[in-house]
């Protein structure tokens, strides 16, 4: 068959670097790994590799794993199984590089095979290379694999896509690796307690998009179970604390976002692995007042076809037949989010001299503040007229709706006065009093 066309098709599935890395990690978790290490080097012979201490593969198992659409008939649909079509290893790897190698240790022996698109393009045949011992020993991080009783090492090389698109390969490569680390932290956050994932020897940070440990501040809605064709979908609504009240530790658990607005909505999980997030999936719920609501939806792998999970395992579509059932579970969290957003529980600091004064009339005049009074008395008639025009524009065109939305979405209190220096305040008061005298 036309191997060149097949491999070209696998490369075009649409992985990002981060989603491709996540697909390789899926295989490690499916192999019951308790430790996963990521290593990379962008210099003379660039490589990216994922090493795990999973169950490893025999020669026959490795040969099957390297085939596009590998046989998955022996794979159990259990919580630890994250595979889908038998394409992930090949499609994810080839989406990022022209050559990838898999070395695996089982029964005390390391075996390795590789695909090189340069060779396949030339021969137009699906040529799978079996590495000899010398070639195996030359693989990056192979000594780490040798130390495990069992395990697997996936190595990417020949990064043609990055080379063709990047102004500076080294900078782009390092950036993509750093982005994949953040992506990994979120996508596999529910495995943090059971599986240790390292990037260059440093364990990834803990993430929690729901702040489940913020007892008394975060609110958890009622857990709902939806039966679909005998399989159970679990829905748990969460309402985060108001943005202005988040502690540094909570911000870190959320990934230190610039805004929590874009992270509202459904968090879809397949076997505890995060598939998609930050969207209401066209259910018409997204709004400023709902931004604190996050809905955990656990989908069993038995319902993959119902949810139309894609090859990359990075998106899914909510079926119409269960939309209404899920929306009922969502409503409680949305109500809580609106209540929390309207009443954030954070007061503005009291100040001695207010630039803005809250009054019942709609004209919002600010003429009576001490600094404006002093300035008005110090000016001549022509300057007073210009000041009057400027103040009128400020009073009439206050962007109150933009201020409301921006302040509700801010992670800190805007112009709270907390950073106002005492010395600066004293100097301004003295200047005003001098004019008043």
Model regions and ranges:
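Short beta-strand element(s) in the Bergerat
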Residues: 46-48, 152
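Acidic ATP/Mg2+-coordinating residue in the GHKL
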Residues: 52
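Glycine-rich G1-box
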Residues: 55-56
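Mobile ATP-lid/nucleotide-binding loop of the nucleotide-binding subdomain
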Residues: 67-70
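GHKL-type ATPase core
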Residues: 75-191, 195-199
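Charged regulatory segments coupled to nucleotide-binding catalytic modules in large multidomain enzymes
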Residues: 176, 216-437
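Accessory nucleic acid-recognition modules appended to NTPase machines
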Residues: 183-232
């Amino acid at each position: 068959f036309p191997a060149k066309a097949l491999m070209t098709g696998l490369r075009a599935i649409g992985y990002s670097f981060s989603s491709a890395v996540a697909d390789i990690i899926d295989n490690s978790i499916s192999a019951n790994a308790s430790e996963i290490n990521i290593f990379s080097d962008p210099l003379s012979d660039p490589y990216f590799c994922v090493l795990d201490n999973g169950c490893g593969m025999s020669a026959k198992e490795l040969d099957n794993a390297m085939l596009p659409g590998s046989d998955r008939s022996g794979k159990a649909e259990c919580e630890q199984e994250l595979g889908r079509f038998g394409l992930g290893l090949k499609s994810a790897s080839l989406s990022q590089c022209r050559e990838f190698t898999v070395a695996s240790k089982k029964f005390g022996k390391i075996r390795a095979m590789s695909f090189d698109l340069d060779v396949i393009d030339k021969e137009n045949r699906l040529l799978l290379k079996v590495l000899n011992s010398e070639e195996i020993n030359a693989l990056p991080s192979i000594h780490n694999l040798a130390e495990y009783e069992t395990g697997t090492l996936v190595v990417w090389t020949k990064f043609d896509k990055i080379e063709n698109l990047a102004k500076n390969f080294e900078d782009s490569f390092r950036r993509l690796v750093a982005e994949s680390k953040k992506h990994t932290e979120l996508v596999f956050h529910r495995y943090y307690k059971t599986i240790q994932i390292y990037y260059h020897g440093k364990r990834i940070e803990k993430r929690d998009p729901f702040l489940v440990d913020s007892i008394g501040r975060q609110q958890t809605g009622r857990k709902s179970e939806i039966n679909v064709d005998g399989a159970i979908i679990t829905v748990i609504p969460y309402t985060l604390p108001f943005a202005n009240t988040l502690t540094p530790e909570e911000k870190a658990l959320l990934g230190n976002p610039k805004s929590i607005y874009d992270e509202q909505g459904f968090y879809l999980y397949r076997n505890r692995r995060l598939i998609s997030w930050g969207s209401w999936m066209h259910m018409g719920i997204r709004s400023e007042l709902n931004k604190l609501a996050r809905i955990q939806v656990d989908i069993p792998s038995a319902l993959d076809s119902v949810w139309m999970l894609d090859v990359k395992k990075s998106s899914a579509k909510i079926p119409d037949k269960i939309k209404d059932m899920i929306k009922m579970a969502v409503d409680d969290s949305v109500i809580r989010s609106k209540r929390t957003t309207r009443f954030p529980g954070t007061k503005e600091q009291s100040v001695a001299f207010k630039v803005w004064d809250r009054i019942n009339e709609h004209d919002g005049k600010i003429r009576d503040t001490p600094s404006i009074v002093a300035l008005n008395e110090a000016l001549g008639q022509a300057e007073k007229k210009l000041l009057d025009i400027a103040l009128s524009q400020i009073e009439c065109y206050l962007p109150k709706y933009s201020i409301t939305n921006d302040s509700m979405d801010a992670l800190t209190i805007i112009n709270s006065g907390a950073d106002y220096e005492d010395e600066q305040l004293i100097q301004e008061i003295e200047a005003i009093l001098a004019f008043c005298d």
